[in-house]
């Protein structure tokens, strides 16, 4: 086809471009605003409250620790998107998941300083999908338990390389070589540029916060000094690289030597002899909010369901009081669940258990106290039996649980006024009590 000659087509083209420019200048904010309507801002702390864009944020969310693992392979990656979409439809704002897998199958960190790019891209996918669905992520950085490597794997690496001081798992906290391993991992992770979004993790507001370690215990030093020293060092190191994100420890919430008057709140005596100390650990200067777990099934041996419910209320109110008076920081209950393996278990008990916990948070939020929200342990989708435990739930298969989750989202949204600004909240909450 011959190239056009003369000025014939030029005037119509210029007219078209002029029209486009006029539309853009006149209505561009409205048109392109649709693309940025769901953009997330960094979550910050104002005293005992989380805030986003100057408004309080109360968290209603869940745990799906398995996201990165399932995002590695094509055949299972869709589960991440499906769970995030389902969470968003329930109005859930935060999902807690693992940003670690040390050694073993689908390891992110194969050995100290060696990373599998394939698995890193899986984590990139998780973060990008969360952003797409408007859900923030609480990313945990290492496990106290052996699952997915944890501190045991770090100790084994040091031992295998002939630099370990001890074969004890607790040497993770005091061995200089292991501390260097962990700091190197932190540096690589925090400065990772997402292959899908082009944003470094430390600059991505999709990440709600970092969790230093899941359920830390250091039973070789019940004074708590060893764990406290490690927390202080590692949190300062993280903040030197990333001062934009919030940071929490990842505690279960057990009281230690620094709170002698609170020891009776612990489930049993053993809980004060784990080397962790809720108030002292959470009061570390670089910790932005406290984290607490709720597992009466694991913590008591002979109590019935009604006794467990009473404990839950006492446990939560005690920690909220700490947030208000001692720490002056938000308190987020980052795991809670009721086992379906109890000998007297009935599905209706789970409804009451969830309702009790949600009511405590709702009342705290109404009074602008430090109870900042909850994360259910754990949500799955169909076909994940191998990842289920006695706490796992496919929420849309249990209508009563799904209704409770949506109701809590709406209640918390109304307190902050966010339902007046967000179309999703308006639609979801318009017929809710």
Swiss-Prot record:
GO biological process, one term: mannan metabolic process
Known tissue expression: Expressed in roots, stems, leaves and seeds.
Annotated residues for binding of substrate: 98, 214, 295, 377
Keywords: Glycoprotein, Glycosidase, Hydrolase, Secreted, Signal
UniProt-annotated glycosylation sites, renumbered to this chain: 46, 169
GO molecular function: mannan endo-1,4-beta-mannosidase activity
Gene Ontology cellular-component terms listed: extracellular region
Catalysed transformations (reactions): Random hydrolysis of (1->4)-beta-D-mannosidic linkages in mannans, galactomannans and glucomannans
Keyword Ribonucleoprotein: no
Subcellular localization(s) per the UniProt record: Secreted
Enzyme Commission identifier(s): 3.2.1.78
Matching Pfam families: Cellulase (PF00150)
Residues of the signal peptide: 1-28
Entry-linked PANTHER family: MANNAN ENDO-1,4-BETA-MANNOSIDASE 2, PTHR31451
UniProt family annotation: Belongs to the glycosyl hydrolase 5 (cellulase A) family.
The protein, known as: Mannan endo-1,4-beta-mannosidase 2
Species: Arabidopsis thaliana
Gene: MAN2
